[in-house]
Amino acid sequence: MTASKTKTEAVAYRWQRYYHTLQTGHYLTVKTKQRLEKSAVFQTQGSLDGACCLHVFAAVLTILGLAKHDALADMSRRKYGVPAEVFQAFRSTYFDGIHAHDFVDLVNNELMLPLSLSLRQAADGGLDKWTMDNLMRGELMACTFASVKNRRTKHWVLCTGCEGSASGRVIKPDTILVLDPSGGEAQYAAFNARMVVPQTGPGSRGGKTVDELQKSKSSKPIDWMYESPIAVNEPVRLTAAVRFRLTEWS
């Protein structure tokens, strides 16, 4: 008599992954090849300025080892180096902010940095999936979003990673982890806010995941639920995303 085989249930769990050089702790830090010591990442946006993009870009420069965190925090008083050049390029946007395509043009045309920027906007189609696919590959991203309800909320955040569920070999990402410059310091985490595909209630669309909702470029954009400890949860849509990659100094 042969023994019958019983099917074992697949192990189910939640997972998170974030950019590989980020180190969590009392506050979020990064360890780069260019610096001996770990460096803080977060830059705080003020209550009067519209420079969320500049604060996000400063965090990107720190993470990629292109400038020191403290020097970037003092960029308006710097006379030389990358922080001074960044402030000169972005000073006119400090109160009004900047759109994603203008940001990419400004970095490419005004700053001689070893960066390769890839931009996708909502009009290009497939923005949600493109963003999540890059985060799943471990890329460093920034995105812009707007409120679904009134469009008055328009904001930049740094995408530090993603989150989702897994059952056996099936992995389903459903959350973008972000570092919001208007929020507080990320403590013992690589994010201080997140954008979640609702599983129930308004905007849930049957509890489907990003891959299921974004099968083609013509798919309807996802209404993400933006969750932050300092604000009421709000449905938002991605309007653009930028991928950052290091190149060689010319």
Predicted regions located by residue number:
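Noncatalytic regulatory segments and standalone regulatory/sensor domains
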Residues: 162-250
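Generic signature of intrinsically disordered, low-complexity, basic-rich segments
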Residues: 6-8, 54-55, 237
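Non-catalytic, low-structured ubiquitin/UBL-interacting segments
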Residues: 1-40, 250
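Conserved active-site-adjacent core of cysteine acyl-enzyme catalytic domains
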Residues: 14, 19, 84-203
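Residue-level signal for functionally critical sites in structured catalytic/ligand-binding pockets
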Residues: 12-13, 18-26, 30, 45-50, ...
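Cysteine-nucleophile protease catalytic domains, especially the papain-like/related folds used
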Residues: 37-121
